[in-house]
Amino acid sequence: HRGSFDDPRLTLHYADAFAYLESTDERFDVVIVDVPDPLEEGPAYLLFTQEFYTLLRNRLKPGGVAVAQSGPTGPAFYEQCFSAVANTAASVFPSVILSEAFVPAFASTWGFVISSLGPDPSDLSVEETDRRIAERVTGELGYFDGITLHGMTSVPKYLRTALAREDRIITKANPLYVP
């Protein structure tokens, strides 16, 4: 973690995220939502709903960003969850970016939905992204830079097509469960 957990700007909250966001007036620059799959009667299925994304949006500072784990994106499993989560986030946030990365623990690619109240970060040039990183980060990053951002947000055509066809919006009344 290269000292990131020691940064005074970081606060980790280990709690029921839905209940926490309902009960706090705190505002955040960045929220990272790393949750288990939405299993029926599981602890996290409400964290995939429009109601949760609305709470999340209302707790972000202007220009704030929320990144959420959004399910598998490989050709065999992407329709389970990913496009519905992205469509749900897009029903709440003005800017939603699709991203995927290989996750060794799952031996597969995994999707992430980046929701923003500000301009679309994927519209930034490689040079502008690198400049912003240099302003905010001491030392050199081993993985992330402007080229990496461009690559991570250039998802395969089948994912873009799935999102274009997607009409599901996940709600408390119409939850999404994965098998």
Language-model segments: which ranges?
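Solvent-exposed soluble domains appended to multi-pass membrane proteins
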Residues: V31, P38, L60, P72, ...
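Soluble small-group transferase modules, centered on the S-adenosyl donor enzyme superfamily
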Residues: L98-P179
